[in-house]
């Protein structure tokens, strides 16, 4: 063994002598004096634990792989000595199995199972090796410590080289290898040499393979991001392996996976998203199947194919099954085409229906770009016979047709409810969507088929689901698509929820023909009890030119195994976009569990993948989650949600969101009635369309535990000279006893007029006006955003998140309403969104309805008006109520248009309100690119009477206006807080941003005012918040703005934190003028105890060419005098570049530019940082300020913090406690820490050329420097005069 180690040393030593040897060298002197007899005997070491301790990290310059050895060398030289040099060699080989040649090529090392360390000293031709007392190499395990005894005589006139050699394999456990070398001798002063090699920490996560796991949250959220700026290749794998053995209780399997790839030019990508369900054991109360989406876009001459398949368990007993769902078909032809579509749902035709969910949601969409005519009727026929108790019937259908020129289309969507037979608590069918668009001379065909189970007993199973297919051809193409759901054909069906949601959309941009049929066949035989079948799949493909695509989405229901009360699968999305002549293929497959015992378990998780390619590259990615493979898992919730965003830097843009709302557990006894309606019409030229979508709820009888109605969407687009009208009305039940009801929901209206058209639309939700309503949750939330600057069309999604479990108390009233209107030329639009809160009666523990969205777009000479109104229940007692929420208004005028809009929320004005959170946030956006005028008012009226206890008052309001040319706009956002009554423990109002942009010769003014409560008793109140004003003038414009927060002026205020932070930013690139005032008025009356006054304000303006600017930011703090002193450097003459040069990171200028006293010896200090050497923010993982009373995160990928725009130049305000040094106060030391090229960084182009370290700290201080003034810190301490 001694001979072997000698060979190791000789080989390494010989390697050192080569001129081409790549080693890591550092020459460090003067850190340790061993008090040896003469000057030349001073031992120079790079490591020490003495007063001048210096720690370094041994870097790895190679990737770890099997059968490799890597060596790190650190040379320590005493330059004051001459003569015969010796070498101290310390080599360490970790506990790794390998057979790697580590010396001469002819010599091969034996497999290592220990760390081997030896010391060799050479004087010319003589080499002495030192190890342990028996002359064998010293061994230890990873994380162990080796002690070497080195004779004193070995120190004289030696040059010492420390060599750290490492064997590696494909797997090295999580560890930090600490190698300690203690030079024992007769000399009185010794040192400890510590090598803390944190970069040697390699990790690989393996799932537990045995043991018992209880109440475990498995898996989770994984993100993979890769960015290639040019001709690159990337691959990523995220794997989810479900448990394959053992007993799992209360598990929900599968989850949500997203894959996104973007190629701006001539690229190819392929991606596979696969979820493997557990393959062994018995599964009880499991959620199987799920939701799959596939999207592919080809802008030129490409071909794509995609298959989305869900394989359900193929046999066994399934009980409590919900079948059927929603189906959508969309086809688009740009010119001179004809299309027809029929969406039909055939419900079961015989028997008695009990506890059925009736009706639902219907949508009709038609688009005519030129001289066309279309008509559409969507009719929901409620059940006409039998006994119906707690029934939710029907579902959601949408029909969309678009004709850009001289076409004709007609469509009928009919839902036939069950008229007879015995059906108990069953949800049948599922949801499918088919969309096809042909941009040029292409052909596509797609089939979406759901095959329900054909035999056996099914108990409490959720099967089927939702499938979507989308294909786009811009010219002269043909497409056909069939979406068919075949329900189980045998057995008895009990407790069935029938039908679901179907959507049909067809668009013809050019001389094409398309036909589509969406048919749902309900089950005609067999025994199905409370079963939810299948899941949701979506497929989207777009071809802008001469391409061909085909896609098949198939769901195979379970044919084997015993499954009881099982909800299978989850949600999967795949999106790929190709802007030029590429090819892509993708397969999304969900394999359901085929064996094993799984009981009420939620596994899986949430995965996101994002890739961006600005130029001709190739990428492939696989997202896979590996779940635990053995053990017992009880009551585990995993899963999650996924979001998708993709941007094309050239010739294309795409975006998308994948959201999964998992059930949250518990017992759900309330029934959800009805569903969602959508209406879309688009007329690009000289066309006319009309459509009516009406849902008639049951008007008589006894309905118990019912959730009524849902979400509606109306979209109309007129590119030229067309007219359209549409009404979407939901009539809630007007009679009977309703208990534990979730009422209504979310409504959206969208209209687009590119030229000289007129449209009107009304979306009204009438809440129940009579009866007793107890423990009611009212539907959900909608957000819609659309901007059309040319002859394009955009639409948004309506998402309703219903509660899934538990008993709901302490009610939240109303919700969120966005309004968007866009008029690109000579148009006029007006819109009103009003929410009327309950004004009287007895309402107990009620959560009232939801969210309404209105969108209108006018590209040319059009007019539109729309009203979205939500009428809350007007009678009853309201106790422990949280009152509504947020309203948004957006209007855009590209040319000579006028628009006005009012968004008003009227809170309850009478009755007893206890523990109420009032209102929320309201954004307003208006854009006028040329010669236009717009005005908007957003007002929130808080409750003005009654007793309010423990109330959180309103929230945030935003106003945005943009004027590209010669326009004028004004806007007022006002929040009126309650003016009477008793208010205790109240948080008042919130944050208000104001943004206005005028690129040419325009004028804009805006006022944002928050009026706090002016009377009553206020105790333990946090007042108001943050206000922002932003104005940008690209040319010859003028703007002024005032943001004022008026705090309460009367009453008793105790333990109050007043106001907050206000930013003001104005930019004038040419010959402009701007002025702005931000003022916070602190309460001037009452008792104020333990109060922190005001907050942070800043004013920034940039004038690149001869302009004028003025700005005032005034913060009036209660009773505290204003005091600010200019800070100065305590030791300005030291050399602060010395430390960064030696440690190899960029030099920087670090200053404290201002301080403001806060009282009690606390100060706000503003730090300014600049450096000439930096990478961009895309290469930054984290930036923070350390060493103060708290850590200040300026940027963090993992924590989602981004408070800087340029990593090389920024300012930040921190709070510090001053240190008194006589006549002035000094700031404590602090550090600035940079971490590059690690967490979240996917584009390594800058990292690969960066000449400095990837992680380093800047240090401040005046207490560590040598006789030449070379400082071991990077900036001076800063002090200021005592104020």
UniProtKB/Swiss-Prot annotation:
26 X 35 AA approximate tandem repeats as annotated region, ranges: 211-1120
GO cellular component: cell surface; cytoplasm
Glycan-linked positions: 66, 84, 99, 115, 123, 143, 157, 174, 196, 266, 301, 336, 406, 441, 476, 546, 686, 721, 1203
Highest taxon of source: Eukaryota
Residues in the signal sequence: 1-21
InterPro entries: Flo11, S_pombe_Mam3/Map4
Start-end of each Sequence repeat: 211-245, 246-280, 281-315, 316-350, 351-385, 386-420, 421-455, 456-490, 491-525, 526-560, 561-595, 596-630, 631-665, 666-700, 701-735, 736-770, 771-805, 806-840, 841-875, 876-910, 911-945, 946-980, 981-1015, 1016-1050, 1051-1085, 1086-1120
Domain Flo11, residue spans: 1118-1283
Disordered, as annotated region: 102-132
Repeat listed as a keyword: yes
Name of protein: Putative cell agglutination protein pfl5
Organism whose genome encodes this protein: Schizosaccharomyces pombe (strain 972 / ATCC 24843) (Fission yeast)
């Amino acid at each position: 063994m001694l001979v072997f180690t000698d060979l190791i040393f000789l080989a390494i030593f010989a390697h050192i002598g080569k001129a081409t040897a790549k080693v890591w060298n550092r020459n460090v002197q003067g850190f340790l004096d061993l008090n040896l007899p003469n000057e030349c005997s001073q031992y120079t070491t790079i490591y020490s634990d003495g007063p001048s301790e210096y720690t370094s990290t041994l870097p790895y310059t190679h990737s770890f792989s099997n059968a490799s050895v890597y060596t790190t060398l650190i040379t320590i030289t005493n330059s004051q000595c001459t003569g015969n040099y010796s070498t101290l060699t310390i080599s360490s080989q970790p506990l790794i199995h390998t057979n790697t040649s580590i010396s001469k090529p002819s010599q091969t090392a034996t497999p290592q199972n220990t760390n081997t360390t030896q010391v060799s000293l050479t004087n010319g031709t003589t080499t002495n090796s030192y190890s342990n007392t028996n002359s064998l190499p010293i061994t230890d395990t990873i994380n162990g410590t080796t002690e070497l005894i080195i004779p004193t005589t070995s120190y004289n006139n030696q040059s010492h080289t420390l060599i750290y050699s490492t064997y590696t394999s494909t797997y090295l456990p999580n560890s930090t290898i600490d190698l300690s070398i203690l030079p024992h001798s007769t000399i009185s002063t010794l040192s400890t040499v510590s090598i803390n090699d944190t970069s040697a920490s390699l990790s690989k996560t393996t799932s537990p393979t045995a043991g018992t796991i209880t109440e475990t949250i498995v898996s989770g959220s994984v993100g993979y991001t890769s960015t290639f700026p040019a001709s690159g290749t990337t691959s990523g794998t995220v794997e989810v392996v479900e448990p394959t053995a053992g007993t799992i209780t209360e598990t929900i399997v599968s989850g949500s996976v997203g894959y996104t790839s973007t190629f701006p030019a001539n690229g190819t990508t392929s991606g596979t998203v696969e979820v493997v369900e557990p393959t062994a054991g018995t599964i009880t109360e499991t959620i199987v199947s799920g939701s799959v989406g596939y999207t592919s876009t080809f802008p030129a001459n490409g071909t794509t194919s995609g298959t989305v398949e869900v394989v359900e368990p193929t046999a066994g007993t399934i009980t409590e099954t919900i079948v059927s769902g929603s189906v959508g078909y969309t086809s688009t032809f740009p010119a001179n085409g004809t299309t027809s579509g029929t969406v039909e749902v055939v419900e079961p035709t015989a028997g008695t229906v009990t506890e059925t969910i009736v009706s639902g949601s219907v949508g009709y969409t038609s688009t005519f770009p030129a001289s066309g005519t279309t008509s559409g009727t969507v009719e929901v026929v409620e059940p006409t016979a039998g006994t119906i108790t707690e029934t939710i019937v029907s579902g959601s259908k949408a029909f969309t047709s678009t004709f850009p020129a001289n076409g004709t289309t007609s469509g009928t969507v009919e839902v036939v409810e069950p008229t007879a037979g015995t059906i108990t608590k069953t949800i049948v069918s599922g949801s499918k969507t088919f969309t096809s668009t042909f941009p040029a001379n292409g052909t596509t065909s797609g089939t979406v088929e759901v095959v329900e189970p054909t035999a056996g007993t099914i108990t409490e199973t959720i099967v089927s689901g939702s499938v979507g297919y989308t294909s786009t051809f811009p010219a002269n193409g043909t497409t056909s698509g069939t979406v068919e759901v075949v329900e189980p054909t045998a057995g008895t069906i009990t407790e069935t929820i029938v039908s679901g949601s179907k959507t049909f959309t067809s668009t013809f941009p050019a001389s094409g023909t398309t036909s589509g049929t969406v048919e749902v066949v309900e089950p005609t035989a067999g025994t199905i009890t409370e079963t939810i079948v299948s899941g949701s799949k979506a497929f989207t493909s777009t071809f802008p030119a001469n391409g061909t695509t085909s896609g098949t989405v198939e769901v195979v229901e379970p044919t084997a195994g015993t499954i009881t009360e099982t909800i299978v699968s989850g949600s999967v999305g795949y999106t790929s976009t190709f802007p030029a002549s590429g090819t892509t293929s993708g397969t999304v497959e969900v394999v359901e569990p085929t064996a094993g015992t799984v009981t009420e378990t939620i596994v899986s998780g949430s995965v996101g993948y994002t890739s961006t390619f600005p130029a001709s590259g190739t990428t492939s990615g696989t997202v896979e989650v590996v779940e635990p493979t053995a053990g017992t898992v009880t009551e585990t919730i995993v899963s999650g949600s996924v979001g998708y965003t993709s941007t094309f830097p050239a010739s294309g843009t795409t975006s998308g969101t994948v959201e999964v709302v998992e059930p949250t557990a518990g017992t759900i006894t309330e029934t959800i009635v009805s569903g969602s309606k959508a209406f879309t019409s688009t007329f690009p030229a000289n066309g006319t369309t009309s459509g009516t979508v009406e849902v008639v709820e049951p008007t008589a009888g006894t309905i118990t535990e019912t959730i009524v109605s849902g979400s509606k969407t109306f979209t109309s687009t007129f590119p030229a000279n067309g007219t359209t009208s549409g009404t979407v009305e939901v009539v809630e039940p007007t009679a009977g006893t309703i208990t534990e009801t979730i009422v209504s929901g979310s409504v959206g209206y969208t209209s687009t007029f590119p030229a000289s058209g007129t449209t009107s639309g009304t979306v009204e939700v009438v809440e129940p006006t009579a009866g007793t309503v107890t423990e009611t949750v009212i539907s959900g939330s909608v957000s819609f955003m659309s901007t059309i600057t040319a002859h394009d069309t955009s639409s948004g999604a309506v998402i309703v998140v219903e509660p899934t479990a538990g008993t709901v108390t302490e009610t939240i009233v109303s919700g969120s309403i966005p309004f968007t209107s866009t008029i690109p030329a000579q148009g006029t639009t007006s819109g009103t969104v009003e929410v009327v809160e309950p004004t009287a009666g007895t309402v107990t523990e009620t959560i009232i309805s939801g969210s309404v969205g209105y969108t209108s777009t006018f590209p040319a000479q059009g007019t539109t008006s729309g009203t979205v109104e939500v009428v809350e229940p007007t009678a009853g007692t309201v106790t422990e109520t949280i009152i509504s929420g947020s309203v948004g208004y957006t209007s855009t005028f590209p040319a000579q248009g006028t628009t006005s809009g009012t968004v008003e929320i009227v809170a309850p004005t009478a009755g007893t309100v206890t523990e109420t959170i009032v209102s929320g946030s309201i954004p307003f956006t208006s854009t006028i690119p040329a010669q236009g005028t717009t005005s908007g008012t957003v007002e929130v009226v808080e409750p003005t009477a009654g007793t309010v206890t423990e109330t959180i008052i309103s929230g945030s309001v935003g106003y945005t206006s943009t004027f590209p040319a010669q326009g004028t706009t004004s806007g007022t956002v006002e929040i009126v807080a309650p003016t009477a009554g008793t208010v205790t423990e109240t948080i008042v109002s919130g944050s208000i941003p104001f943004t206005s942009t005028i690129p040419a010769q325009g004028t804009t003014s805006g006022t944002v005012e928050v009026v706090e409560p002016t009377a009553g008793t206020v105790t333990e109140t946090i007042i108001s918040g943050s206000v922002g004003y932003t104005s940008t003038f690209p040319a010859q414009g003028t703007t002024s703005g005032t943001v004022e927060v008026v705090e309460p002026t009367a009453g008793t205020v105790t333990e109050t934190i007043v106001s907050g932070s206000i930013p003001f930013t104005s930019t004038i690139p040419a010959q402009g003028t701007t002025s702005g005032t931000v003022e916070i008025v602190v309460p001037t009356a009452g008792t104020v105890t333990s109060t922190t006054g005001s907050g942070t304000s800043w004013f920034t303006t940039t004038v690149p060419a001869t302009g004028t600017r003025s700005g005032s930011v005034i913060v009036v703090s209660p009773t505290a005098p204003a005091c600010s002193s200019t800070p100065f450097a305590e030791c300005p003459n030291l050399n602060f570049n010395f430390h960064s040069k030696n440690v190899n990171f960029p030099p920087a200028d670090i200053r404290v530019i201002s301080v403001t006293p806060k009282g009690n010896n606390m100060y706000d200090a503003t730090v300014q940082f600049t450096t000439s050497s930096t990478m961009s923010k895309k290469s930054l993982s984290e930036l923070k300020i350390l060493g103060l009373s708290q850590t200040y995160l300026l940027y963090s990928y993992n924590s989602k913090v981004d408070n800087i725009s340029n990593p090389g130049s920024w300012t930040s305000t921190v709070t510090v406690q001053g240190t008194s040094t006589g006549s002035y106060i000094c700031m404590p030391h602090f550090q600035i820490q940079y971490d590059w090229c690690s967490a979240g960084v996917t584009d390594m182009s800058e990292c690969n050329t960066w000449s400095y370290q990837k992680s380093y700290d800047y240090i401040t201080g005046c207490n560590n420097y040598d006789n030449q003034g070379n400082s071991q810190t990077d900036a001076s301490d800063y002090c200021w005069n005592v104020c």
